[in-house]
């Protein structure tokens, strides 16, 4: 930056001593030192912020590259799945139709109108709605015994009281 040697610094100090005088020189030197320190801290903060921004920019570019690679992988997988689905639909249509390719060229029924493959509509029969509140069957007692399922549940306090030895029990008081 500035080429200040020892001789130039001594010259500046002598001029400041003559101009300011011995009484005000220490106060001015303290003020100048404080201002110089503030300037250095400000410059260091700016440098740190610039380096942080550069790192963030690098991270952003890495993130976009990673997202692009993930999108490419996803698109490749979807393309492969669509291709296999097309092959399966063609095989299904040729196997299901009695005429072979004639039925595949002119599909009829609900799958042709909705645009869905025929194997989806045939396999996916409308499911009955069940009422989850109504219990349809009871688990047999023999099954509960065989699988050692608890049929009568006790609280922890009742279980402790049941297995406590008689010597440790409190005497029962009746009026």
UniProtKB/Swiss-Prot annotation:
The membrane spanning regions, by residue number, are 1-21
The record's InterPro entries line, in alphabetical order, gives:
TatA/B/E (IPR003369), TatB (IPR018448)
Q: Where is the composition biased (Basic residues)?
A: 160-175
Gene Ontology CC entries for this record: TAT protein transport complex
Low complexity compositional bias, start-end: 94-115
Region of interest: Disordered: 94-118, 153-175
Give the HAMAP family listed for this entry: TatB (MF_00237)
What does the subunit comment say?
The Tat system comprises two distinct complexes: a TatABC complex, containing multiple copies of TatA, TatB and TatC subunits, and a separate TatA complex, containing only TatA subunits. Substrates initially bind to the TatABC complex, which probably triggers association of the separate TatA complex to form the active translocon.
Tell me its family.
Belongs to the TatB family.
NCBIfam families assigned = tatB (TIGR01410)
**What name does the UniProt record give this protein?**
Sec-independent protein translocase protein TatB
Species name for this entry? Burkholderia pseudomallei (strain K96243)
Taxonomy, top ranks, is:
Bacteria, Pseudomonadati, Pseudomonadota, Betaproteobacteria, Burkholderiales
């Amino acid at each position: 930056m500035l080429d200040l040697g020892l001789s130039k610094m001594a010259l500046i100090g002598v001029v400041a001593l003559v101009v300011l005088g011995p009484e005000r020189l220490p106060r001015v030197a303290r003020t100048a030192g404080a201002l110089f320190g503030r300037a250095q801290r400000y410059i260091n903060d700016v440098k740190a912020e610039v380096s942080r921004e550069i790192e963030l920019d690098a991270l952003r570019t890495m993130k976009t590259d990673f997202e692009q690679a993930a999108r490419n992988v996803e698109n490749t997988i979807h393309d492969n799945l669509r291709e296999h689905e097309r092959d399966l639909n063609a095989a299904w249509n040729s196997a299901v139709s009695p005429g072979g390719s004639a039925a595949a060229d002119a599909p009829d029924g609900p799958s042709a109108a909705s645009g869905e493959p025929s194997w989806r509509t045939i396999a996916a029969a409308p499911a009955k709605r069940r009422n989850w509140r109504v219990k349809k069957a009871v688990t047999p007692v023999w099954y509960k015994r065989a699988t050692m399922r608890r049929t009568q549940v006790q609280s922890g306090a009742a279980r402790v009281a049941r297995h406590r030895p008689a010597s440790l029990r409190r005497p029962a008081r009746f009026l």
